[in-house]
Amino acid sequence: MKKISIWIDGIKDVRMDSLEENIECDILVIGGGIAGLSTVYNLKDSGKRIVLIDKNKCGMGATSCNTGKLTFMQDLIYHDIESNYNEKVARLYLNSQKEAINIITSIIKKEKIDCDLTKTNAYVFSNDEDKYKNFDKEIEFYKKNNIRYKVLSSLPLNYPSKMVLETYDSYVFNPYKYLIGLKRLLKDKISIYENTRAIRLDKKNDYYLCTTSDNYEIKSKVVVVASHYPFFIVPYFTPFKTRVEKFFIGASFSNDSKNIQMT
């Protein structure tokens, strides 16, 4: 079985060189996914010297494996936010999601990026009657915030469902093709280096020094870390993901079953 994202299967891309010298810049962006390239896109006319690096090819990380959905409807999230915080916070989150959708679709249309952008509807469904009350609470939030919706008894697909909530103004697109479009648009305006892994980031007096796995250095006034996971340990932060270098359990038993030694 071929294990490859449907977004990148059969898609050709322009390869960028890897970093092979020490350089300086005003802004360094680490990570060439949708966060990194979107950041660079919005800075492209700033007049700053901008460098973007990615440990592999741009867009081959988390972005290439996402759902390809642009929707403010993410399960029954607004009911959850409202329950844990308040309606104002839930509304702020809703507006942020709508703004993100508008930003991406506007860029696609303005730059004429071919990424299969299609307007569609979004759905949340359940067959668990115990969860129906949560649908009612989500609908109440929709009503208060003028969100168009429809309650259905089945999905458009041939999939069993009893409670279906449908909303409008969502999109689907190929995120990898979108990033390819951004990269081609930006490659002549900024410096993009692929297969360039950042392994160390040090704060100096008035600049940052990023060291790569090939022992090259990037001196920058500002650094944007747009990688899926941070590649460095931040003081007072707990690492969410670390590499397991070695793990084993050994045991020796004596005649006394209570005497067990673990290593």
Where are each of the predicted segments found?
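Flavin-dependent oxidoreductases
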Residues: 200-263
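Extreme N-terminal leader/targeting segments of oxidoreductases
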Residues: 1-27
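Helical element adjacent to the flavin cofactor pocket in flavoenzyme catalytic cores
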Residues: 141-143, 164-221
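Dinucleotide-binding Rossmann-like beta1-alpha1 core, especially the glycine-rich loop
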Residues: 73-152
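N-terminal Rossmann-like FAD-binding beta1-loop-alpha1 element of flavoenzymes
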Residues: 23-52
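Glycine-rich FAD pyrophosphate-binding loop
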Residues: 45-65
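Redox-cofactor binding/interface segments in oxidoreductases and associated redox assembly factors
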Residues: 30, 72, 225-226
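Helix-loop-beta segment of a Rossmann-like dinucleotide-binding subdomain
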Residues: 87, 114-124, 153-181
